[in-house]
Amino acid sequence: MDLEKIVNKGINELSPYEPGKPIEDLERELGIQNAIKLASNENPVGPSPRVLQMIDKVLKDTHRYPDGNATKLKEIISRKFKVNSSQVTIGNGSNDIIEFIARTFLSTDDSAIYSEHAFAVYPLVVKAVGAEGIEVPAKNYSHDLQAILKAIKNLSLIHI
């Protein structure tokens, strides 16, 4: 069976993610020590003692499935920002939320606009759902809002 024939065209056009080199490899190749790697959104100082305490506190319950709706967290966020908890969406990081948005609002007949210096996930999720991605050149390393307006045609989503 040829999987490429049955897989969504947008998925077939994606390239696999290539993670950055492990810090150990980089130090060995460059002959350096104590490098601080920031490229992969890693924290060079590790978790705070408070975070470690909280992890220890909840560790005893890790054999149970968590609340898939994140009810308590949604309630806390909704109170803090004075919105209804139904207006709060929880995901596993920004990539997850961006993918929810693309899957909800885009299809193969749609397009999405993003700036050339926008988050790298925007074009990936647009392509994955088979929509047309429209990359608008930046102006002085900023979003060119006038160019974004001019690029609008059959638009479904703008990523800023």
Where in the sequence are the language-model features?
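Conserved beta-strand segments of alpha/beta enzyme cores
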Residues: 34, 87, 132-134
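Short beta->alpha connector loops at strand-helix junctions that form conserved
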Residues: 116, 132-139
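N-terminal "arm"/small-domain region of PLP-dependent enzymes with the aminotransferase-like
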Residues: 1-64, 143, 149
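Hydrophobic residues at beta-strand termini and immediately following loops
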Residues: 38, 65, 91, 136
